[in-house]
Amino acid sequence: MRKQATAIWTAWAALLFLRCAAWAEDRKPAWTLGLFVENDVFALSDGGYTNGVKLVWVSSGLGDGPGKGRVPRWLDTMSRKLTPSRTPDRRRFVSVALGQSMFTPEDILRKDLVRNDRPYAGYSYAALGLHRATPASMESFELDIGIVGPESFAGDIQQFLHRVFNWSYPEGWANQLKDELALGVAYDHKWKVLPAGKAGEGNWDLITHAGGMASNVFTGAAGGIEFRLGRHLPDDFGTALIGPGGDSASLFDGTAPRLPGRGNFGFHVFAALEGHAVARDIFLDGNTFRRSHRVDKLPFTVDIAAGIAVRHGRLKASLAYVYQTKRFKGQELKPLLGSLNIAVLF
């Protein structure tokens, strides 16, 4: 089973690399490669949602006719059916992502099962996103497939990194959730409330969003708001955390660049608030079809983020600190983590 999982994830990574290399041959219009890294080490802690990594490729704007986009014909056809461009200012995009998330109890030095804390859990996944956007709003549809459990290799990776960097060694991964195939669909809608002008116009804006996901990993709804203030605000839809629809933060098109003129410089600070209504969370509720450790999750949670973003030429980077309310009953510490996002236009 371990060899089969290795082959599957290697094939996914190779496919992503080869397709990106092929699409890069034609530089007009442009596409974007984004890297999301979230870790509690930025907040000098270790436990809870301890690490998340996501590599995202986002296409350029696709044409309305079959085969006009720089993606495989079947994917372009799917995008046209699910996200039709009915108005001249509406553009379609496709995204492909590979990601992994890790969860541990606060005391990672214990080898026994920590019954009053969340279970060890790892999740590795691939995601296909279809997006349609106007200058003032964007919709995202996403399909996720992955695996929870030892075959996600999250435990192996954390133990390896802690050994290499001589950090406190996580001893309890033998108690992690069992292997489970993960399938899910998600929807997210973002709106630029004020102002919704052309790229680079104005020194501030306000972005709201609402959406939800249905899967055996996570089922629930979310909504939030982000305020941005700075110089030459980018023509995108905010700085997202890892999650369904988060790929859209990397959307970047040569016909509507985040900044007027690729050599210009811009920066801004931002603050965001997001609330969640949680029906299911496998990382707290435990495995869906097998007995495993679980805790009593809280049905409503909140994330508060603040950070800074800079953009120069083809590169955009942002760094945020995120405060999370407690996720389950009896949780002693409120989670803190840092979120780094780097996006490059090709």
PLM features: what roles do these ranges have?
Residues 33-39, 94-102, 143-149, 208-216, ...:
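Transmembrane beta-barrel strands of outer-membrane/channel proteins
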Residues 57-59, 100, 130-132, 189-193, ...:
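Residue-level signature of outer-membrane beta-barrel architecture
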Residues 47-53, 120-124, 139, 179-185, ...:
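Residues that define the transmembrane beta-barrel architecture of outer-membrane proteins
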Residues 25-65, 93-108, 278-284, 297:
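Short glycine/proline- and aromatic-enriched beta-strand/turn motifs that initiate or cap beta-hairpins
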Residues 24-30, 61-92, 133-140, 193-206, ...:
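Short loop/turn motifs that connect adjacent beta-strands in outer-membrane beta-barrel proteins
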Residues 77-156:
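Long, hydrophobic/aromatic-enriched structural stretches that serve as scaffold segments
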Residues 106-110, 226, 232-346:
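Outer membrane beta-barrel transmembrane domains
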Residues 112-116, 169-175, 211, 290-294, ...:
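Extracellular loop and loop/strand-boundary signature of outer-membrane beta-barrel proteins
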